[in-house]
């Protein structure tokens, strides 16, 4: 259809704009419906991020074509076929421009929180991930704007220059959509709350103090699990069994499970109500080994897991991988700690789904390459 517009077929311009408006509007509705369904069926999924992130982008396209179609029907002579094609071709750049205020605010927040994190926690590579991401986000926008400015000053862009800019914009579009989708999924997952009918409460371990006692971060997870257990006991009268999960690091005097078990005992939880999993060295093993213990006690028990707010979504993904049906809850952390930790989780999420992302990026690259060549034919 776009090729027929390019050939100048009479009457096709208005109707193609209308078809594109309807098409993109339907895609937005389908993506939003899929996102809502995903929240009910399986919140902890890469698809949750994808559906929301790209729904916003397609919504911007649908809105643009609503505007074009309305004015095209009002004054057909004022519109040319190039506007329809170039709206699609420059959609990635236009979306970056539309979301630039959000990106600027997001990057500034990451930068400030990282500076505070370094002041409190010291300089380590993992503590500057937010600064690196902030720089990349701003640098991408500046680079694309510079290339467009250069073309405006020195004349029309060549096919290959335009292709390079559009592919760069498409690359940034993808990761921007994933950042937005990931941020929304993280917030929803962190605010999620399990029903007060759980049989098992898994508490995910993390680094201990030098003396082997829980750090404030780990105490936050333990206290949240205790609060939930007490609230459930009061509301439904149902007692839950704690599963403390975490092995022993090379620099730790005891396993994280042993440290958590001692803390729960100090809070008055009976020894027989605590199951210890002390072999795991990562989140996936936390879930796998905890599931083994739970299945040995009671098959198909209702499970909740407790971690820190920034880690709930990715921990939920690991639970899905382990075949564990569980609802996650997140303990609060210091304001300057969450953004950088969320970036670390985001990077981890991307590296774990390389094949799926490669397919999506390749598809996006093919689409924008085809549109670029079409615009120059």
What are these regions (language model features)?
Residues 169, 183-341:
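A structural signal for short, hydrophobic/glycine-enriched beta-strand patches
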Residues 1-195, 296-302, 306-377:
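Extended hydrophobic blocks
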């Amino acid at each position: 259809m776009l090729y027929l517009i390019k050939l100048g077929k009479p009457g096709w311009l208005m109707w193609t704009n209308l078809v594109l408006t309807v098409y993109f509007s339907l895609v937005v509705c389908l993506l939003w419906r899929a996102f809502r369904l995903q929240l009910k069926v399986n919140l902890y999924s890469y698809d949750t991020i994808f559906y929301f992130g790209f729904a916003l982008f397609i919504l911007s396209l649908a809105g643009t074509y609503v505007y074009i179609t309305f004015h095209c029907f009002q004054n057909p002579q004022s519109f040319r076929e190039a506007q329809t094609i170039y709206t699609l071709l420059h959609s990635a750049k236009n979306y970056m421009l539309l979301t630039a205020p959000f990106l600027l605010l997001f990057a500034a927040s990451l930068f400030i929180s990282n500076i505070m994190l370094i002041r409190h926690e010291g300089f380590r590579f993992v503590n500057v991930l937010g600064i690196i991401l902030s720089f990349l986000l701003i640098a991408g926008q500046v680079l694309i704007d510079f290339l467009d400015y250069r073309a405006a000053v020195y004349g029309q862009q060549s096919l290959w220059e335009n292709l390079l800019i559009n592919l760069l914009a498409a690359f940034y579009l993808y990761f921007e959509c994933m950042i937005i989708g990931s941020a929304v999924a993280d917030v929803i997952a962190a605010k999620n709350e399990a029903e007060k009918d759980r049989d098992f409460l898994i508490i995910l371990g993390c680094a201990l103090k030098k003396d082997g006692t829980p750090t404030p971060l780990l105490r936050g997870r333990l206290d949240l699990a205790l609060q939930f257990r007490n609230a459930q006991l009061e509301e439904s009268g149902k007692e839950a069994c704690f599963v403390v999960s975490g092995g022993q690091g090379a620099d730790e005097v005891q396993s994280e499970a042993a440290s958590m078990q001692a803390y729960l005992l100090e809070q008055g939880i009976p020894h027989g109500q605590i199951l210890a999993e002390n072999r795991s060295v990562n989140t996936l093993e936390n879930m796998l080994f905890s599931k083994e213990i739970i299945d040995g006690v009671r098959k198909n028990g209702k499970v909740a897991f407790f971690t820190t707010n920034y880690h709930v979504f990715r921990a939920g993904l690991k639970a899905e991988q382990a075949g564990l049906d569980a609802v996650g809850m997140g303990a609060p952390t210091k304001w300057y700690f969450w953004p950088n930790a969320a970036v670390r989780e985001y990077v981890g999420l991307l590296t774990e789904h390389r094949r799926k992302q490669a397919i999506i990026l390749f598809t996006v690259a093919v689409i924008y390459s085809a549109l670029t060549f079409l615009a120059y034919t």
